[in-house]
Every structure is written in structure tokens, then in C-alpha cells.
Amino acid sequence: MSLDAILSGAGGATKLGAQMLNSMPVLLIPGLGGSPRIYAPVADALWGFGPVTVANHVRDDTMGAIARRILAEAPPRFALAGHSMGGYIAFEIMRQAPDRVAKLALINTQARPDSPEVRERRGGQLARVKAGGLHEVLDGLYPGFVHPSRHDDSTLRKLVHDMGDDVTSEGFVRQLTAIMARPDSRPTLATIRCPTLVLSSDTDNTLSNTLSAEMADGINGAKLVIIPDCGHLPQPEKPRETAEALVAWMQN
């Protein structure tokens, strides 16, 4: 089956792909302020391998509680992909239930906790969102989310706003609270034994490639893929390149 067939879903690729690969469930976790919309550009390619679910990560305010609830609702064994905050949650899932994760993809994320400076900045964002300024905070984050060539992309900016509305101000506050208190996941890297993809972008102004390389170096056998001319949101910015990397990960 060709990559084009898998990516397009043409010619019965979804059903056939699931049969060929014993229908591995795929669990996707969005980032801060992200909703299932973030994975829409690449989800069809993954349906060729099994059922695809996007986790609900807005209901709890600690990484431990978020991971426990996701695990309670997840299949017994699955391929796990986490984007940004979703990567922080993925690390917590690896600590709680490593044997349930068949494959791991860490997308534009990091293993380090927030520095005091970043935590202080997030505290300001938290206060503004609580005061009703969710879209104001998202507009402030947007330039760091995307490649400079997309700063004036009204469609992409609308996606960020729409996802924020999906999450709601209350959900965003819970997410930020969990992020600010998350543990250092660098000690977890050496414990990961499943096939792992570390996917990053060459122009991610939110989380640098140095952080991606640190994760790839720390996980035995991990593969590092860097998407060119792309910011922090590779799924909508570079959907084909992102889908190709994820399909190769699932085929590994």
C-alpha cells in the first residue's frame, strides 16, 4: 500500500491497513489550548492502522489526574502521541502504565519542567484568562506558535481561537495549573522501552530543537525528525510532512 493511499484513505486503505497491522489503537493528546481540531489534518492517515481517539485533557488540574483519567478511558494497549502539553501528559502515562504503550510519539514537546521565569509568565496568563481574557492570551501566544510566514494567516489564527473556545477558559486554567506544577520528566527518558518518535520543527519558537534532541538522546533507539519551515503546530502547518512521519512511526 502506498503512502499516498494511506494518507488519502483511498481504495479501502483504512480497512486494509487496520487488518494488516492488527488494528493498533492510536491515542492522540493535544497541547495547551488544543482540541481534537489540531489532529484533524493528520488523523485520516492514522486511521489506516486502527481506531484513532483524541484524549480529553481539560477536566483535571494535575498531570497525574489527567493521565489517570485518560488511562481509565483508553484501550488496553495503544500507540500514544502527545503534542506539546500532550507530551507532558504522555510522560506521566509512561510513568503510570508503561506496559500499555506500544509506541510513543513526542511532538514539539520537552522533558524539562518550567523554569521560574516561564512559570511566572504562565502565572500572568492564568490571571488574564481568569479575568476573561482567553483570546487575548491566545493572541499573545500565537506568534510563538507558528512559523513567521504564518503570522498573518487568518485561518490558522482562527483555528487557535476555535480550539481555545473548545477548551473553554475554565479548561485552559486547569491545563495551565497542571503544566506549571508538572514534574521533571528527564529521569523518565531512560525508562522508555517502546519505539519512539521525537518530532520537532526547525522554527519552533516555543520549544527549541535542543530540547527535542535531548529527548531523542535520552530514549534508547528514539528517532528524531525535524520538519523544515514549520513552527510549533506541525499538524496544521505541515500536515503532509507530519502525517508521513507519523505513518513511518506506526509502520516501524
Where in the sequence are the language-model features?
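Conserved alpha/beta-hydrolase catalytic His-Asp/Glu region
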Residues: D114-E117, G132-T191
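Catalytic histidine neighborhood in serine/cysteine hydrolases
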Residues: A213-H232
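Acidic catalytic loop of the alpha/beta-hydrolase fold
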Residues: T203-L207
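Short beta-strand/loop motif that positions the catalytic acidic residue
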Residues: I192, V198-S200
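Flexible "cap/lid" loop of the alpha/beta hydrolase fold
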Residues: M63, R95-Q96, R100-D139
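Conserved HGGG/HGGXW glycine-rich cap/lid loop of the alpha/beta-hydrolase fold
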Residues: M20-R69
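Gly/Ala-rich beta-loop-alpha elbow adjacent to hydrolase catalytic centers
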Residues: G82-G86, A90
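Catalytic histidine-centered segment of alpha/beta-hydrolase-like enzymes
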Residues: C230-A243
